[in-house]
Amino acid sequence: MTVDTDKQTLGFQTEVKQLLQLMIHSLYSNKEIFLRELVSNAADAADKLRFEALVKPELLEGSGELRIRVDFDKEARTVTIDDNGIGMSREDAVSHLGTIAKSGTADFLKHLSGDQKKDANLIGQFGVGFYSAFIVADQVDVYSRRAGLPASDGVHWSSRGEGEFEVASVDKPERGTRIVLHLKDGEDSFADGWTLRNILKKYSDHIGLPIEMRKEHYGEDADKPAEPEWEVVNRASALWTRPKSEIKDEEYQEFYKHVAHDAGNPLAWSHNKVEGKLDYTSLLFVPGRAPFDLYHRDSAKGLKLYVQRVFIMDQAEQFLPLYLRFIKGVVDSADLSLNVSREILQSGPVVDSMKSALTKRALDMLEKLAKDKPDDYATFWRNFGQALKEGPAEDYANREKVAGLLRFSSTHDTTGAQSVALADYVGRMTEGQDKLYYLTGESYAQIKDSPHLEVFRKKGIEVLLLTDRIDEWLMSYLTEFDSKSFVDVARGDLDLGKLDSEEDKKAQEEVAKSKEGLASRIKAALGDDVAEVRVSHRLTDSPAILAIGQGDLGLQMRQLLEASGQAVPETKPVFEFNPAHPLIEKLDAEQDMDRFGDLSRVLFDQAALAAGDSLKDPAGYVRRLNKLLLELSA
């Protein structure tokens, strides 16, 4: 390699200096992750070369034996990671090593918590793994040449991690990238063969590429041979190609960390080989925590796709539906072409068949997790439950299966935890109950004592309490479970079916008929603010309630539309009153039309507040309430 030419000094992307300092100081107890990250990057570089060489075999430059080499020099106090993968051009080095992938600097800084374990988990997720080199090194030199470029187009990138980096042109006969870490004072322990081998065994044994280290000689053989001898220190076989019986849990966990760029362990995994009409192997993982961008439209999602063990692409979204975008893993197919493109993957019988099978496999994995490890499933639900709730709308074929995985709060559990499965609810249904009842609202605290629940509590009927913003939208697609219909207890004219006796129904009709005059008076007082006024069959303790019209949008859907800037259709609630309540009896007896109007309006506003809605005229409500209080105290 010749001396540097055409040298430039450039500044890091804004905030990278701060980022480096934060990483160095917040991750000092997890120093060994630098090797995991750099080896993982080297493996990715080999995958990219394999893929590009499918179309341009000349990129292999006569050498298709890909490998990673890790070396050290005790005297020089250096550690070197060398690969013969795709390599970088000068422009690549400036853009890839001078800025942060995904423009993620600000997000990374925002998510650093001071908890070293959590912060270590963020490194790969934000595409900043290269910078972990500065945890142990006070200077990093990178020598690289992109495959296909002449030897004279090599690049030397160098930085001390202090806000600037130098880049220069060098001759580099071999393609690929060599990273030389100049260890800080006190980090000499990493310039040791035994230490490096242990770290590689711990973090990188699953890498499907040979990782080589120089063979060390001791005793009588201590004289080094003229040419270094290299030995493979990892298994160097793709984990998913090995029999399941030979793979330890720890190996699956380390492979997950590599493929998902996550330092935490997965909650579950499913490893399957399919043979028959289609031949493919899949290894799917359920992460232990949600990525920061799970609900971002352009977030990374999809499986790593291999064809006959040749890497094709990251983030192949075509093999799982969007609601399962949190699933990580690999799929290795023998039925797809090596030159498959994202466009080709958009449709076709092979892809469609694989997607259907992989979706079922992922849902089966979640069912098993829920059955065998309910505490882990509760963790999964906290992280990914809202994504899974998109399933009934997106995946009609698996709607019932997805519904069985959903969890809700209910009146059965006073903790408010989303722990009730629909199958559990069905198992607790009372005699004569043929419907599944639910109520939506902004929070458990807001709806747990809702007047809409009064008649259900009286009859001992469980009601699901749906408090996620997505829930009302979900229920517009999830209309039944186990052949039983869902009923919103706040919507329409409540009909409890067999839960009300014929005598009850007849009595309700008689009361409604006897109070038609009162209903007309209240409707006149409330005017166009209500669609209808009627006697309520929902109430036992409260004086009044607002019901949603059968075809109208509820509060959650209105808020969703408003938040997205869409027009919200005007709707009017139905005012229902409890004829047995003392306030309604007093209202019925009131002859003063002004007082009747004020009391009707106060009851209407209170019902709106109980439903979680805001008042159109809060000052008017306070004025009327104060007036009535003064009259009562006179």
UniProtKB/Swiss-Prot annotation:
Gene3D superfamilies: 3.30.230.80, 3.40.50.11260, Heat shock protein 90, C-terminal domain, Histidine kinase-like ATPase, C-terminal domain
Positions of region (A): 1-342
Residue numbers spanned by region B: 343-559
Region (C): 560-634
Major subcellular site: cytoplasm
Recorded GO MF terms: ATP binding; ATP hydrolysis activity; ATP-dependent protein folding chaperone; unfolded protein binding
Biological process (GO), any one: response to heat
Segments forming a coiled coil: none
SMART domains, alphabetized: HATPase_c
Record's GO cellular component terms: cytosol
Signal peptide: none
Family: Belongs to the heat shock protein 90 family.
Subunit structure, interactors included: Homodimer.
NCBIfam families, alphabetized: PRK05218.1 (NF003555)
HAMAP family referenced in this protein's UniProt entry, alphabetically: HSP90 (MF_00505)
Annotated protein name in UniProt: Chaperone protein HtpG
Lineage of producing organism: Bacteria, Pseudomonadati, Pseudomonadota, Gammaproteobacteria, Lysobacterales
Gene: htpG
